[in-house]
Amino acid sequence: VITDHNRYVCCPTTASVEPGPARSPRVGLVVAIGAISTGAILVRWSAAPAAVAAFYRVLFTTLPLAVVAIWRYRDAFGAIHRRDAIGAALAGLALAIHFASWFESLAWTSVAASVTLVQSQPLFVALGSWLFLRERLTRPIIGGILLAVGGVVVISVGDLLGGSVGSNPALGNALALIGALAAAGYVLAGRSLRQRVPLIPYVVVVYTVAAAGLLVIALLDGAPLLGYPTREWLLFAGLAVGPGLLGHTVINWALGHLNSSLVSVSLLGEPVGAAILAAVLLDEQPALATIVGGGIVLAGIVLTARGATG
């Protein structure tokens, strides 16, 4: 992830806030959130199996980064300790589970519900940090977690009462939550590793393992890897270039100019942007329970993020 409270680490960044005018970074941040918001729409447009779309999304994101890594960081790979390499591999497996489950969830539930629930990973990061890293849970964090759980309950009850979008909203929502849990595992696995391993080599190792994991999932599912029409290949490339490279590259650039808390909370614009795009491009109107519950979940995430950074 970009920071401990975001979903992905994909490109180099600086942790400090650099001086200079903030207008361009803020505009860039808005553009990046818009690019990330297209991810769910592109997955919905694709007719390929979820694991295949996820595999090519990760593969096409990894290839240009691998070129940079070989060109500038070749010696860094040999310096990675075996224990750190294993940790990076585990992070990659967690990332594979995240993409596979989230992409699959979009086949069963609404874009708004899926993206909102998968974005809840900061809550699981906070819980995991408390359970495994012995980090303290402050009152804002606890309150944010409870608030977000309440939002999930609202969405789930709305699904049970009917009126929700999707052929099996309960399954789709559960898969999205699994995606959030896996993303949290990815963040927690990488938190300590990033203090010792340079970013680009770390990302290349993680994404290579993630691509391999998704390839295995696709093969076990019996999904074809080739033979797709040009439209599908364009969608695969769009997933890598838009949400993968453009979105997160610009976010990492913005992190060098803006406060990390602002960037972290701004990522909550993804569910809003995705829901708007789904309404316009897919004619998908989220159910009232999804809107209300999603708002509660997002409020809980904001409270948790502020408690973790305050």
Where does each model-flagged region fall?
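Glycine-/small-residue-enriched transmembrane alpha-helix faces in small-molecule transporters
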Residues: V1-Y56, F60-P64, G150, G162-S192, ...
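Hydrophobic transmembrane alpha-helices of multi-pass small-molecule transport proteins
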Residues: I2, A89, G128-S129, L137-L160, ...
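Juxtamembrane helix-entry segments on the extracytoplasmic side of multipass membrane proteins
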Residues: A22-P25, A47-F55, I80-A85, I142-I145, ...
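Membrane-interface helix-cap regions at the ends of transmembrane helices
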Residues: G34, T38, T62-H81, V149-P169, ...
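Hydrophobic alpha-helical transmembrane segments of multi-pass membrane transport proteins
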Residues: G34-T38, L42, V68, A89-W108, ...
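Hydrophobic/aromatic residues within transmembrane alpha-helices
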Residues: S46, A53, R57, S105, ...
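Transmembrane alpha-helices of multi-pass small-molecule transport proteins
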Residues: A48-I97, P122-F124, L181-Y186, V204-D221, ...
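Alpha-helical transmembrane segments of compact multi-pass small-molecule transporters, enriched
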Residues: F60-P64, L117-L131, V209-G213, V265-L281, ...
